[in-house]
């Protein structure tokens, strides 16, 4: 998508001040065929709840393990030690 937006700019820089030689309209080769007709809609892969769970749950577990290890490291090296004085809700 970025290349299709840069294509007219590059052509204009190469050709200089001769904009009548180049079309500065958008180039959408992913939507239209060379003859100008619309391409058929691409096949959609179903994204089921099982795939979602198999993707999200391991990420959450890995993130929790990393956070736990970092918290233990900080507490062991006395970089951050939670104090009981912060729990004053009265």
UniProtKB/Swiss-Prot annotation:
Predominant location: mitochondrion
InterPro entries to which the protein is assigned, alphabetical: MCU_reg
GO biological process: calcium import into the mitochondrion; mitochondrial calcium ion homeostasis
Keyword Transmembrane helix appears in the UniProt entry: yes
Membrane topology of this protein: Single-pass membrane protein
Mitochondrial intermembrane side: 77-90
Cellular compartments annotated: Mitochondrion inner membrane
Mitochondrial matrix-side positions: 1-48
Keywords, alphabetical: Calcium, Calcium transport, Ion transport, Membrane, Mitochondrion, Mitochondrion inner membrane, Transit peptide, Transmembrane, Transmembrane helix, Transport
Function: Essential regulatory subunit of the mitochondrial calcium uniporter complex (uniplex), a complex that mediates calcium uptake into mitochondria. Required to bridge the calcium-sensing proteins MICU1 with the calcium-conducting subunit MCU. Acts by mediating activation of MCU and retention of MICU1 to the MCU pore, in order to ensure tight regulation of the uniplex complex and appropriate responses to intracellular calcium signaling.
Family per record: Belongs to the SMDT1/EMRE family.
PANTHER family: ESSENTIAL MCU REGULATOR, MITOCHONDRIAL
Self-association and partners: Component of the uniplex complex, composed of MCU, EMRE, MICU1 and MICU2 in a 4:4:1:1 stoichiometry.
Official protein name in the record: Essential MCU regulator, mitochondrial
Organism: Tribolium castaneum
Phylogenetic placement of the source organism: Eukaryota, Metazoa, Ecdysozoa, Arthropoda, Hexapoda
């Amino acid at each position: 998508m970025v290349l299709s937006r840069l294509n007219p700019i590059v052509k204009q820089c190469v050709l200089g001040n001769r904009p009548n030689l180049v079309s500065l309209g958008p180039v959408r080769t992913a939507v239209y065929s060379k003859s100008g007709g619309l391409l058929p809609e691409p096949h959609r892969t179903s994204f089921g709840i099982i795939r979602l769970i198999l993707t999200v749950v391991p990420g959450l577990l890995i993130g929790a393990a990393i956070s736990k290890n970092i918290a233990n490291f900080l507490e062991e090296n006395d970089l951050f030690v939670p104090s009981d004085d912060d729990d004053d809700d009265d």
